[in-house]
Swiss-Prot record:
Gene3D superfamilies: Ribonuclease Inhibitor. PANTHER family: LEUCINE RICH REPEAT CONTAINING 23, LEUCINE-RICH REPEAT AND IQ DOMAIN-CONTAINING PROTEIN 1-RELATED. Keywords: Cell projection, Cilium, Coiled coil, Cytoplasm, Cytoskeleton, Flagellum, Leucine-rich repeat, Repeat. Residues 3-27, 306-332 form a coiled coil. It comes from Bos taurus. This is Leucine-rich repeat-containing protein 23.
Length: 342
C-alpha cells in the first residue's frame, strides 16, 4: 500500500468541514478552554517506551524497502507533558497526540517522513515546526495558539487551527504553502481577514470570529467554499470577480441589514449557494425574491433551492428594472436641454 493510499484513511471529511452545526463545535471548544483554565499545573508525564508499544501500529517498509517499521502512533488522552522520546522514531508517518498537556512539539522536527499530524486539545501556544517535506494534513485545534507563524510545509494540504486564540493571520507564505487547499480558523478571535493570501486555497472556514468585514481575499481565485458564520459583518464589500471559483458562501448569523448589499455579490460568477439565515435582512418580506433579483445565477438560498416560478418572477422584475433605468436615461438628456434653453 502506498503512502497516498494510507493517507486517504486519515484525511479530513469534507462533509464534516462543511456541515452547519457549529453549535456542537462551540461546546467542544468551551470544554477544552475550561479544562485548560482549571488545570494550570500538570504533573510531569513524559512519553515512555511502554506507551510507545501500546500506541504503535501499521507495519510498513522503510524508505530503502529492505526493513520494516511501525509508522502510525496514537497516544491520545494520556496526560502527556513531554514527547521527547519521539525524536528517535524517525519512520513515523501518522501521529496523534491529541488531548494531552503538551506545550512543545519540537521533537516532531525529527520526523521527516511525517504525513499526518493531529495535536488537538493540548496547551500549545504555537504551531511552529521545522519544514516537514511530506506533511500533508495537520490539526492543532482547541489549543491556546495565538499566531500562525512557523508553518511552511510545502505539501501541506489541510491545516486546522480552529478553537484557538488567533487575532491576526500572519506568516502564511504562498511561496512555501504551495499545496494548501483547506484552512480551518473558526472559533478564534480574528478581527480581520487580511493575511490569507493563498491563491491555491479552496476551502476557508472563518466562522465564530470577530470579523466586521471581508478584506484581502480578492486574489483567492480557486476558493470554492467560504464560511463566515457567526461574525459581525454588516457590509458585503470585499468580494470581487477575481474570486471566480466561489460556489458556497455562508454568512449566517451576521449583521447584514440592507438587502441592497446583495448586489455586491453579483460579480461572483459561480456563486450557487448562499446562506443568510439569522441576519436582519431576512426579516424583509421580499428577502428571498430580492436575493434572486440581485444574483441571477443563485441556485439555493439558505436551505431551499429556487423553484422555476421564483426564477421566472425574478427575471421579470430584472427586465422591468432595466426598462425603467433606460427610460430614466432617456429623460435626463431632455431635461438638460430644457434647462439650457431657458
Amino acid at each position: 500500500m502506498s503512502d497516498e493510499d494510507d493517507l486517504e484513511d486519515f484525511e479530513t471529511d469534507q462533509d464534516d468541514l462543511e456541515r452547519e452545526d457549529d453549535e456542537k463545535e462551540t461546546e467542544e471548544w468551551e470544554d477544552y478552554r475550561k479544562e485548560g483554565e482549571e488545570s494550570e499545573d500538570w504533573i510531569s508525564t513524559p512519553l515512555t517506551e511502554d506507551m510507545m508499544k501500546e500506541g504503535l501500529s501499521l507495519l510498513c517498509k522503510t524508505g530503502n524497502g529492505l526493513a520494516h517499521a511501525y509508522v502510525k502512533l496514537e497516544i491520545k488522552d494520556r496526560d502527556l507533558t513531554d514527547i521527547h522520546l519521539l525524536r528517535s522514531y524517525i519512520h513515523l508517518r501518522y501521529v496523534d497526540v491529541s488531548e494531552n498537556h503538551l506545550t512543545d512539539l519540537s521533537p516532531l522536527n525529527h520526523l521527516t517522513n511525517l504525513l499526518w499530524l493531529k495535536a488537538d486539545g493540548n496547551q500549545l501556544r504555537s504551531a511552529r515546526l521545522n519544514e516537514l517535506p511530506y506533511l500533508q494534513i495537520a490539526s492543532f485545534a482547541y489549543n491556546q495558539i495565538t499566531d500562525t507563524e512557523g508553518i511552511s510545509h510545502p505539501r501541506l494540504a489541510s491545516l486546522d487551527l480552529k478553537g484557538n486564540r488567533i487575532h491576526m493571520v500572519t506568516g502564511l507564505d504562498p511561496q512555501k504553502l504551495i499545496s494548501l487547499h483547506t484552512l480551518e480558523l473558526r472559533g478564534n478571535q480574528l478581527n480581520s481577514t487580511l493575511g490569507i493570501n493563498l491563491p491555491k486555497l479552496k476551502n476557508l472556514f472563518l466562522a465564530q470570529n470577530m470579523l466586521k468585514k471581508v478584506e484581502g481575499l480578492e486574489n483567492l481565485s480557486n476558493l470554492t467554499t467560504l464560511h463566515l458564520r457567526d461574525n459581525q459583518i454588516e457590509t458585503l464589500s470585499g468580494f470581487s470577480k477575481e474570486m471566480k471559483s466561489l460556489q458556497y458562501l455562508n454568512l449566517r448569523g451576521n449583521m447584514v441589514a440592507d438587502l441592497g448589499e446583495l448586489a455586491k455579490l453579483r460579480d461572483l460568477p459561480r456563486l450557487r449557494a448562499l446562506v443568510l439565515l439569522d441576519n436582519p435582512c431576512t426579516d424583509e418580506n421580499d428577502y428571498r425574491q430580492e436575493a434572486l433579483v440581485q444574483i441571477a445565477h443563485l441556485e439555493r438560498l439558505d436551505k431551499e433551492f429556487y423553484e422555476e416560478e421564483e426564477r421566472a418572477e425574478a427575471d421579470e422584475i430584472r427586465q422591468r428594472m432595466k426598462e425603467e433605468q433606460e427610460q430614466e436615461a432617456e429623460v435626463e438628456p431632455e431635461s438638460e436641454l430644457d434647462q439650457s434653453s431657458t
